[in-house]
Amino acid sequence: MIIGVGSDLIDIRRVAKVIERHGDRFLNRIFTDAERAKAARRANNEKMAVATYAKRFAAKEACSKALGTGIRHGVWWRDMGVVNMPSGRPSMILTGGALRRLQMLTPQGLEVRIDLSLTDDWPLAQAFVIISAVTPGNL
């Protein structure tokens, strides 16, 4: 059962300008420690590092849309974090207000699955999020 679908498309150059202007203040406000660490591993290639941030920014926007709130009503940027499963597949971890919203939307007795697709092709980055409620054990 699909709970929500969200998508977002962002210009990577826009993210680069915000990082240039606000630096760590922006990065610390928007991204989780794990997301910043992922981008830091790509620091030797500035375009790749900025694209990493842009894809994660788009994922947060898409996830907030799938939750039906956008970035408001107690759902904040750092409540949504992009993680990679052991297989390499990207997914999202929700905390705080985003997790509370997800719990409100999830029917009793079902588990949540968050599918995430990320892509970039300079100068654009895109994310799609599908949040589903599934029978336990069918993740």
Swiss-Prot record:
Entry's localization field: Cytoplasm
GO molecular function annotations of the record: holo-[acyl-carrier-protein] synthase activity; magnesium ion binding
Listed EC numbers: 2.7.8.7
Predominant localisation class: cytoplasm
Cofactors: Mg(2+)
Family assignment from sequence similarity: Belongs to the P-Pant transferase superfamily. AcpS family.
Task performed by this protein: Transfers the 4'-phosphopantetheine moiety from coenzyme A to a Ser of acyl-carrier-protein.
NCBIfam families membership: acpS (TIGR00516), pantethn_trn (TIGR00556)
Protein's UniProt name: Holo-[acyl-carrier-protein] synthase
